[in-house]
Amino acid sequence: CRGNFRSTWFSSGGYEPVADILFSHCNVDGFFLEYDSDRSGSFEPLRFIKNQTVVLGLITSKFPELEDKDAVKARIEEATKYVPLNQLCLSPQCGFSSTEEGNIMTEDEQWAKVRLVREIADEVWGDQ
């Protein structure tokens, strides 16, 4: 997470500078990656992914407005240029609060984001 204090962030930059070492040489089963804004760069660094699961954090947890389903699905499709669909998952880019102050969202708005993730995942992956 690149920060999640009252709907703000503290870091930006793509994964390219660390992608080869991080994705090719870390002995882990998966990566949870923030991709909810341009601050995270492109999906191209995912070319270094081997057999790990990649959880794409495409749904922002900073603001209550719901993302467009078709736009999110298009981003998932874009990521499949680098990682097979069966290795991809979808999630919010971070938890809904990294600090006790939280973000500028109500609990109902947070649950709407969770439902959106579920709906898109059902449409993209179905019963896989």
List the model feature ranges, each with a label.
Residues 1-128:
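Domain-level signal for soluble alpha/beta catalytic cores
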